[in-house]
Regions:
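Active-site gating loops and adjacent loop-to-helix segments of metal-dependent hydrolytic enzymes
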Residues: 82-115
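Acidic (Asp/Glu)-rich catalytic clusters
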Residues: 151-161
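Generic structural signal for residues in well-ordered beta-strands
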Residues: 16, 59, 164-166
């Protein structure tokens, strides 16, 4: 059994009726085998008083850093990410019509592997900023459904790391 004790965490509760003092309180977080066991102040002292063998507990001092649930990106086009790097894909005028034209030309020769490779880079960047839930649109105007196939494969491959919801576009 693995046990971690995260001490000195600033917990963002966001609970209705919470006072400023309650939402700013420093708490400790006890995790056993990847499951939250307890969130309370002074857990280390409590565990020691209960006779817990602290030698087997990994203690991480968060130094008052904010701890909150992961973020959700509710509108992303993972099949489009980094396509502007392809020759001829840049929307020079910045207009919607040119953007649509450039994408139409760019997607014609995209492969499942290429979309997955670029999407993985985009997902990694999202995760580094605290995002764990992503709702991505998939272009379904391609008769081969290349984008949809790529993103559905990626959803399955990354299911233990990030939650992907795929919607058609």
């Amino acid at each position: 059994m693995s046990t971690q004790l995260f001490i000195n965490a600033h917990i963002a509760t966001g609970m209705p009726g919470s006072t400023a003092a309650e939402t700013a309180a420093i708490q400790d977080i006890l995790v056993e085998d990847g499951k939250f066991i307890s969130i309370a102040p002074h857990l280390k002292a409590t565990l020691e008083a209960q006779g817990k063998d602290m030698a087997s507990v990994e203690v991480v001092d968060l130094g008052g850093k904010l701890v909150c649930p992961p973020f959700c990106d509710s509108h992303l086009h993972l099949d489009y990410v980094f396509t502007a790097r392809k020759p001829g894909a840049v929307n020079e005028s910045g207009t919607l019509f040119e953007g649509i034209q450039r994408w139409s030309e760019t997607k014609a020769d995209l492969t499942v592997d290429e979309i997955k490779e670029r999407a993985k880079i985009g997902i990694a960047k999202e995760m580094r900023h605290g995002v764990q839930f992503i709702r991505s649109h998939a272009d379904v105007t391609d008769p081969n459904l290349t984008s949809l196939k790529a993103l559905l494969e990626l959803k399955e491959e990354l299911k233990d790391t990030v939650t992907l919801q795929i919607v058609s576009f």
